[in-house]
Swiss-Prot record:
Its main location: membrane. Residues 1-37, 101-118, 182-186, 269-277 are extracellular. PROSITE patterns: G_PROTEIN_RECEP_F1_1, G_PROTEIN_RECEP_F1_2. GO terms for molecular function: melanocortin receptor activity; melanocyte-stimulating hormone receptor activity; neuropeptide binding; peptide hormone binding. The gene is Mc3r. Keywords: Biological rhythms, Cell membrane, G-protein coupled receptor, Glycoprotein, Lipoprotein, Membrane, Palmitate, Receptor, Transducer, Transmembrane, Transmembrane helix. Brain. It is a multi-pass membrane protein. The keyword Hydrolase does not apply. Receptor for MSH (alpha, beta and gamma) and ACTH. This receptor is mediated by G proteins which activate adenylate cyclase. Required for expression of anticipatory patterns of activity and wakefulness during periods of limited nutrient availability and for the normal regulation of circadian clock activity in the brain. It holds the Pfam family 7tm_1. This is Melanocortin receptor 3. Glycans are attached at residues 2, 16, 28. The keyword Secreted does not apply.
Amino acid sequence: MNSSCCPSSSYPTLPNLSQHPAAPSASNRSGSGFCEQVFIKPEVFLALGIVSLMENILVILAVVRNGNLHSPMYFFLCSLAAADMLVSLSNSLETIMIVVINSDSLTLEDQFIQHMDNIFDSMICISLVASICNLLAIAVDRYVTIFYALRYHSIMTVRKALSLIVAIWVCCGICGVMFIVYSESKMVIVCLITMFFAMVLLMGTLYIHMFLFARLHVQRIAALPPADGVAPQQHSCMKGAVTITILLGVFIFCWAPFFLHLVLIITCPTNPYCICYTAHFNTYLVLIMCNSVIDPLIYAFRSLELRNTFKEILCGCNGMNVG
């Protein structure tokens, strides 16, 4: 990535080829080559990027075409899919650029390479902020569904959801520009780390509160007949909350190594053990791209309506309810 994340080496670097000047000496100390940078073939990044793009485009098409999916939660999922597409597109384009540079088929100026590097890093930054904000928006949506069920449709309308999505992407665009402007400052990394842990803590608090309330509520209505439809509605709300909890868990699992990488760059850039960890940067990028691949699978697994819409789109069927 940019020099604020990964110290520059003797040749132009991009995320997929991040180098650390101290790594060779650390490797010699280890004696086993553990600190050597992990090399991942460009084909892996390209394959993950293509699969992720196709999956997330399918998610967006499904929500747009099926009127039954025109609800705030699914619009937020569309926005999350767009964020996943952005990170996959960024890494794929960057991989292609790295291949071109290494093949010597084109001679590119260092200034141009650095400029493109900042753009790709900015795209990843935008994707990260968008993912966090959309996950938080979905968490709030589920929170309102459970705690204010009777007023949900007046509190969280489609218009409000779309306005919130637009606001999220405007803020993400501003963050992307700021990332390029202050690309040499470590404060960019500090801000990303702070946002990540603050949002995770906030979402964790919301979900704990939701599940504790839902558990108590289910216990209270367990003995009552479900004639009024309260139990099925509560079950539907909880199913949505469980789905988003799974998404949040996968997000944390896939992004946490990358953020630990950033933390170590800030706190112990010369420590041999920290250098060993940061030498596996490419592995953390693969995990990030895997998150973009896994998310659509979670949508399909947890939503029968979305799964059926996927089948109808892929099979070219016309029996779809368009709203």
